[in-house]
């Protein structure tokens, strides 16, 4: 996928609020190694490096465009690397991931895989968007179905009616308990975003949800796709104000030891 960091940061404050809450959930702990999985442009990775100045802090992301912005955030204990979360190597005392794991399937298996990279006594801290059932996403899937030929049948979750990999807080807690985790906290929180009509909501989705679709379409088909999606959004939100109740799931867990 081709990410646009400038587009993503057009709603910087709304996107940063859940990350700050996740940071606040991380308990005090000695850290030698910290990793930020799906670090994007690296602002939160830098915050981790400042909070744990004696630790080696790694920001990992698959997007060259995002990491190009991150390279400017120099600190002696901070480095960035391009790579896939599923190819993670090494062991860590803190594994942090803000709004990234929702792009990966099978979260019970994913958490088990990440858990193997967490040192005893270490903490896993994760935030994922949980708005897959929001009307805006359903309308996006409808638009993808309309463009099935151009997209080769692709939709965000694999099939036209595929389920999101994101779980409920209770299910995440159960999975973590099954891994032997202690001190588990898992919660859901709504972060309201007020947007200027359907056009504002389209601008919001351009930073995230639209990315995998537009990455698969040429310029002309991409413009047609956006126009068809915007028409659906305007039909649902004809006014000049959209109240977007953005739900997020946040959880932390400590590995005994």
Model-identified regions with their sequence ranges:
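Conserved Class I S-adenosyl-L-methionine
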Residues: 43, 161-257
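A conserved beta-strand element that flanks and buttresses the S-adenosyl-L-methionine
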Residues: 96
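Conserved class I S-adenosyl-L-methionine
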Residues: 1-32, 43-47, 66-69
């Amino acid at each position: 996928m081709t990410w646009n960091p400038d587009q993503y940061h057009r709603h910087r404050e709304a996107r940063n609020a859940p990350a700050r809450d996740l940071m606040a959930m991380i308990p005090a702990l000695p850290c030698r190694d910290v990793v930020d999985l799906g670090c994007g442009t690296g602002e939160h990775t830098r915050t981790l490096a400042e909070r744990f100045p004696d630790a080696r802090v790694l920001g990992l992301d698959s997007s060259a465009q995002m990491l190009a912005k991150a390279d400017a955030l120099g600190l002696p204990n901070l480095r960035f690397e391009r790579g896939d979360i599923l190819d993670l190597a090494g062991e860590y005392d803190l594994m942090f991931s803000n709004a990234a794991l929702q792009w990966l399937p099978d979260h019970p298996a994913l958490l088990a895989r990440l858990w193997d990279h967490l040192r005893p006594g270490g903490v896993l801290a994760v935030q994922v968007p949980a708005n897959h059932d929001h009307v805006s996403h359903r309308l996006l899937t409808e638009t993808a179905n309309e463009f099935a030929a151009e997209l080769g049948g692709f939709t965000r979750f694999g099939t036209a009616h595929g389920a999101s990999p994101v779980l409920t807080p209770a299910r995440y807690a159960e999975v973590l308990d099954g891994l032997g985790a202690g001190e588990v906290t898992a919660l859901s929180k709504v972060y309201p975003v007020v947007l200027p009509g359907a056009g504002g909501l389209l601008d919001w989705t351009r930073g995230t949800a639209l990315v995998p679709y537009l990455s698969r379409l040429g310029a002309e088909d991409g413009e047609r796709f956006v126009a068809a999606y915007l028409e659906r959004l305007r039909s649902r939100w004809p006014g000049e104000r959209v109240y977007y109740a953005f739900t997020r799931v946040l959880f932390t867990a400590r590995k005994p030891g």
